[in-house]
Amino acid sequence: MAQIVFSPSDLAPGDHRSKSLDLSPLTFDRIRSTRDPLFELAYGYLWKEFGAKDEMELRETLDRRFQLASQMRYEMILVRRHDEFVAVRDHTAIMSRDGTQAIVHLSHNLVAPAARRTGLAGWMRALPLTTARECLKEHKAAPGTRITLVAEMEYPTDDDHSRLIRLKAYERAGFRKIDPAFVHYFQPDFRDPVEIDKSGGPVPLPFQLVVRRVGREHERVISGAETRRLAQALYDIYSPQFRPGDLAHPLLALERYPQDTALIHLLPPTQ
């Protein structure tokens, strides 16, 4: 596994103040297996933050995802200062079905309160580019093949301050959201299958897609075809952990998306 390369050019346009952060006191460990000695530590931090909100996968799910390295690259990155927790994130890189771009699903990102507003968050948003490039190399992609980072984010509400802070941070960094007035993206139902069946069937949840199209951050529209590729990649990442019937829900059908030639606005995430 390659070492992480901290290249300032990988930082999002609005994250360049992160260049001044001294990273030398920090250790960045990449985790690619549930058998990694650091997995339980990293997973524990993520579960404590996101598990109670039903926003974190079970160990068994992640173990299966780790084992699909030939199809997708899932990893965690744990950041520590000596033995002190500083940050942790996880993400998955996968090639689009047509091979035109590497797509990285940004899953979870947790920075300790003492490390916030130091510039570290900017690097945590940029680190998945290393995984994307490894994915491109693994699939022998042509030089210059595009990379897109994509996150599923809840819609902004006035009563959820932490959500608004998170959206504002991505907005300042230069991420944009695909206009939800035209693209109605839904995340599959993550509940236990027994619970899904007891409740009468899956209930996909609405999310907005927030993206960083690396090298194209200045563009303010995205095509229907590219939008569909992004959503398909997310569903391809999820598919091994879901029953086919649950993924066949009408709200997850990509036929609902705008036609390939349509141009969809890229908006500020808080809008």
Q: Residue spans of the language-model regions?
A:
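Terminal substrate-recognition subdomain of acyl/acetyltransferases
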Residues: M1-T34, K140-Q271
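Amphipathic alpha-helical segments that form well-ordered structural scaffolds
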Residues: L41, Y45, L127, K168-R172
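Alpha-helix boundary/capping detector
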Residues: M72, A132, I196-D197
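Polar/charged side chains located within well-ordered beta-strands of beta-rich proteins
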Residues: E75, R89, N109, R125-P128, ...
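Conserved acetyl-CoA-binding loop-helix of GNAT-fold acetyltransferases
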Residues: V111, R116-H139
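A conserved beta-strand-loop-helix scaffold within acyl/acetyltransferase catalytic domains
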Residues: F28, R32-S33, F39-P113, C135
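Short, well-structured alpha-helical interface segments that form or flank functional binding sites
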Residues: P37, Q101, G119, W123, ...
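Short loop segments at secondary-structure junctions
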Residues: H82-D83, A114-A115, R213-E217
